Amino acid sequence: MSIWQPGPRPAWVTALNETCDPGWITLDADALAAEAREKTGLDDFGDDRFWEPFRIFVDSLNEELALHTMGALLIRGDLVNALTIRLQLTEERKRHPQVTQENVDRPIFITGLPRTGTSITHELLAADPRHRAPQHWEIRTPFPAPETATYLTDQRIAEADRQIRLWCEIVPEYDSMHELGGAIPVEDVQVMGGSFVSDEWMGRHVVPAYAGWYNEADRVPGFEFHKQMLQHLQWKCPGDRWVLKSPSHMSQLDALLAVYPDARIVFTHRDPLKVLPSVVSILYSTAYVRSDQVDAEAMANWFTGETCKMLLDGMTSLRASGRLPESQCYDLRYAELMQDPVAALGGIYEHFEIDYPDSSRAAQQSYIDNKPRGKHGGHKYDFSDTGLDLDEERERFSDYYARYQVENEA
């Protein structure tokens, strides 16, 4: 497989990595927890189930991943931040028990294979002023709780923007792969990060031991933490409904429904053969933010045609079983979304019996008008980069193409 290769790093990043030993940056589970306690003056991390995946992940970082110095600094900050949020969230729920009674009613979840339009669908539904979507700034720094009066002007938005700019300086090509910004809606894996039962940790790092644990783990604790975060975020800044998103939900729909039995789920559909080369290059670039030694072959083997087929078959089987009623599902095709986004979104509103006023349509159209495709440069990839046989892969997905009326793009 031919995989996207990064360009040279900025001189300052190279200088830091060459002159400072990453071993100087301690990644020890107990020391990280102690730092979070000292930072907050709090001691209760809440549900003890997080300790096992947290420790496995930290051990995996130390034993399996060759972090460069900048990468070690970034992950250390991420881990202390996640632990800090756990402490603050637990304390808030004790001091303000009314937060635990906040009702998360019929949230809309968007999921599908990666690169099938989940992000733009999420952003457009979030552009409806009645909707609430978790933004990067309030997930990175959720305390104090966001408030309606200052939501659009909170100083944490600018702080989050600066953090994201740092990522894009370390790997400049990263900017062209995704819309990024402090006030951009984020994936649920980030909301779930503090549970340590989340693709957030596996998606940024090549950590086989943690991945092995995660793939066999009960995902419900991740969604329980997710719901606690939503209760916190909506306490002083509510919306009519939550709109949420993550391709990772394709592998954990049962767990999602265990915590959100009334969830309404939008499944995005696109030719899997268009998806494959794009996903691998994004995984590679994300890992490269934190390590110079990224195994391209391992990345390619992590997300394969077999992986896609398993996820799609799992979705279809769940729906066929009746455990996920069709009244709670909507199928959104990428081709229709690209052709006429507002009309395509209209189908979601109609299916879920949500009113769709002109003000919502206008807000979404304005978002589209201010976000032309390719605005940040192109993320270029081609099926030929995979080294796979096109006809064989098309046959693999023939049932999927027919059932969900998906166009061939490769």
Segments the model singles out, each with a brief description of its role:
Residues 140-242:
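PAPS-dependent sulfation machinery
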Residues 91-101:
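Pre-Walker A adenine-sensing motif
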Residues 1-91, 206-223, 230-237, 279-331, ...:
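PAPS-dependent sulfotransferases, especially Golgi type II membrane carbohydrate sulfotransferases
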Residues 109-128:
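Glycine-rich phosphate-binding P-loop
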